[in-house]
Amino acid sequence: MTTTLINALRDSLASEMALRKSRLESLCVLIVGVLVSRTVNLSHLAGGFPGTAEIASNYRRLQRFFEQVRLDYTALARVIVQLTGLGQGPWLLALDRTNWKLGRRDVNILMLAVLRDGIAVPILWTAMDRAGNSTSDQRSALLSRFCAIFGAASIAGLIADREFVGTAWMTYLAKHDIPFILRIKKDFHVRLADGRHCKIGSLFQKLAKGGRRYLRDDATLGLTAKGQSPAVKLAATRLASGELLVVATNTEPRTALAHYKRRWEIETLFAAVKSRGFNLEDTHLVHPERIAKLLAVLGAITESW
């Protein structure tokens, strides 16, 4: 069965991936090995390869793949869309970050994924070389790569949590006509269309649990001492826990909250590739480029999750 899967996958990838036959076969064997064994631990994968090769030989083969092979991530993004049947969009995208520690090393991944049927499909990612939040430049570079491949018109909306705000970042999204739905903090200052200034929390302080409120008139957020956001509309709800959830958007505010609720799908993705799925933390890979290759393997098998 695994040989049949490997051959079928090789046929699918051959027209898209500019790899020598032996390296394409290594990629396919790796993808099927992860799919069958449900782990990314290289030692375990080496023991699950089809054929009669010794485990030590298979392990060296995996090491050479991660050390030597250069992958075309633009082609891979198209392959993932093709293999998962996503069509041509427009898609709801989620931007998020996941991280873990391997010894003293921090592994930190910035991920852009398409939301689909309860789980996100990873399309592009950046393996960052330091701990902590991403920068505006890193986010912009990731979105620019996506738009170069699929076009900005393929984005129905970009959803992101409170970490992913900022004057430069939101200005980039507005400048490139990317519809966004970004959760914002309640202590942000806002300037309303009538000229009033207040904090987000005080603006919606009377909102009852389960209640919703939409501000359709343009407002601006005072994100830093140096600048304000582009014009946005606001939508808010009070969660059952009593927590206030407010999103800033350049789309229709009445649909923004419904779209934002789907952000959990990228959390499901992270759970699937980490401790509740393929145990991504078990890999001993820490080099950003090698982590990126491993994520490419996981992206190719999203449909199986």
Predicted regions: what they are:
Residues 1-40, 51, 76-78, 87-91, ...:
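Single, function-defining residue in the core of a domain
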Residues 49-61:
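Short, basic interhelical loop/turn and adjoining N-cap
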Residues 45:
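Short alpha-helical "recognition helix" segments of helix-turn-helix
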